[in-house]
Amino acid sequence: MPVLPRARGPVSAAVLDVLAGRRAAADLDLTGHVEDPFGDDLQLALYLCYELHYRSFDGVADDLEWDPDLLALRARLEGPFLDAVRARVAGGDDVDAAVEALLVEPADGTGPSWHLARVGERAQLDEYVALRSLYHLKEADPQAWVIPRLDGVAGRAKASLMTVEHDEYGAGRPERVHARIYADMMEGLGLDTTYGAYLDVAPAPVLATVNIMSLFGLHRRWRGASVGQFALIEITSPPGAARLVTAIERLGLPPEVSEFYAEHVEADAVHEQLVRKDLLAGLLEREPELAADVVLGIQASTLLEDDLADHLVRCWSAGESALRTPPAAPQSPVGSSAA
């Protein structure tokens, strides 16, 4: 299990106190403390709450996963985050238009995969891979929450989702599980493959891209958004993965380092068709009222991925690290005398 990270403000400090058994969630009052919904403090607090449903943390009681007071606290963090996301996206219920927009690749893009393919340095590639490990070492897990929420009798959507997930989990071969292939790439780059090793240095935009998956996946209410977010990944990943293969080759790294991205160039090109023709179409055939939620899932994840891309490229273009430097001093939690 990963170790608990350092706090990034009063809210995350308070959640860490709860997880460490130093106080009860029922004692927390967040009034006036939830400020920037995209900031480090709220995003880490949410990440901590969500991680209890995955691997949790060393020394944290398993019973806290379903502690009603901690779940209520999480809900008070989710509200401002989701409201802020929805305020920044166009909305609507035209799924076809949202998907078609994903299929348009710019001739001259500016995101991190473009940067790394053209001029990226080895240290920047390492940072990218390290930061993305927060998702890729549990790749496909957030989307697995939606499986029991899809119709299994008229199972077109469920069958297509399971086909893709089956591939993500190695199609029965442990060494081909995508999280395992990602860890192999990290090892080839000399990075720490421990689950959660880079949480302390992951800035808020990284946490937000993972948190939105967990938020949508853990709420049946947002099953349509979870499917939309999953569609975004499968439709848009092949071109970016191809550029990352180019970046690895340009840097003179051995072919095995690029295997993860090479796998996604091929596999996700097939997955794109499954997602469009069966998963999305099958879901909306049974539950057409979820169209707006599917669009939200696509738009929300696009927004947060763009925020992350802006952060990475801005830092790298300025000759700076994109990693976050943890605070030297402990943060005062909500409700403490120093808060």
Question: What role is predicted for each listed range?
Answer:
Residues 1-335:
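Non-heme di-metal
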